[in-house]
Amino acid sequence: MQVKNIIVYNDYGHIYGGAGKIAFDSALALAQKGYHVVFFCATGPVDSQLEAHGIEVVFLNQADALSDKNKMASACRNIWNRKAYRESLKCLAQYSPQDTVVMVHGYVKTLSAAIFSTFRKRQFKTILTLHDYFTACPNGGFFNYQKNAYCTCKAMSTRCVLTHCDSRNYAYKLYRCVRQSVLNHCLRRAKKYIHAYAVSKLCEEKLRPYVTQFATKSGVLYNPIEIITNEKIDITHNNAFLYVGRLTEDKGIHDFCKVVTELQLQGIVLGDGYLLDDLKHQYPNITFAGWVNGSDKIAYLRQAKCLIFPTRHSETFGLSVAEMLSMGVPCIVPLGCGAVELIRPNDNGLTYKMGDYDGLKVAVKQFNQTEIATWAARMSTQQLPNLSMATYLSNVERIFSTL
């Protein structure tokens, strides 16, 4: 298929979360390659870089599910966004499915399942990137927030529906199940046009039983990583263990803080979230820098001897792990996380059983028992897959050729 136009669908018109960053950065890169790119989004603000790069923006100007003050209207719209459906049909009508491809990154927060019905109705080939598990699991993570543990239920089975796993309450879990039923119906009806790509081998394996029900083709499409600096970090004189990410229970931030405190290690946390104030009060020994970018971020990264990625749920990948490895910083990662495929134990990092705090503590001790110069030498010879934006675009264009 000779692709001329690409319509990118994403909940937000700016960078919000990992999926949003990929949607935004890839849209800019595709436009720079000469494609006519349309960015279809619902929730603002819209980043001015889009139009500055010649990207056409379709903006619905709607609040997302969490910030909308009218919770009932928001809940209904989150199941079926009528405006998104209507405007998507209008947008698609301006292009031909013979030379135009749809790329979907985020739809759960605002756009809803309605957009998939428009792709089927207008017969557009759709590349759906599986940044999370929402195409199968009602809460998007195969994670029981009540038990703070990985969930083993088959998604949308009777056992799943009857299990209170939601971070809020069981009524909200039932609402999620209704939303999931609508999404499943829309996806299955659009199966002829959907090509679904997971962001890691683990993600692809977990979603395979579900993806076969709604996608005509599937595979793995690795996300590109941000090249913050081309220089490698010299860890030989560094002392800090680093955490990068949201400060939420499921990300394992408490495990990070606890282990560096108990072992009397230096800790740096880059990220924000609802736990920030409590963590600052509870762990005054740890540096909490919030979200930082550019030279400020590089300054903190240069202090790191190791990244701890203590997530308690099955992350589809873990971009921060790939980014730190690319800069020469070893990582400690739990088994069952997508980024674990990048780790060669005792070479560029260590692994432990997900959710096992004692296992994490053993791994951190083991890391410290090895001379830092030895870790540095091992990191200097590591071979990582090429996760540059150029490689990502090449893989996307290869997919275009198979449509």
Q: What do the predicted segments below correspond to?
A:
Residues 330-333:
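Short hydrophobic beta-strand element within catalytic cores of glycosyltransferases
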Residues 33-82, 91, 273:
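N-terminal strand-loop element at the rim of the active site
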Residues 202, 224:
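Carbohydrate-associated surface elements
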Residues 371-401:
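A charged, aromatic-enriched C-terminal amphipathic alpha-helix characteristic of glycosyltransferases
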Residues 336-346, 350-351:
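Short acidic/histidine- and often glycine-rich active-site loop of Leloir-type glycosyltransferases
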Residues 225, 234-251, 257-262:
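Conserved donor-binding/catalytic core segment of Leloir-type glycosyltransferases
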Residues 121, 134, 146-196:
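Membrane-proximal helix-turn-helix segments that form the acceptor-binding/catalytic region
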Residues 277-299:
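Nucleotide-activated donor-binding/catalytic signature segment of Leloir-type glycosyltransferases, i.e.
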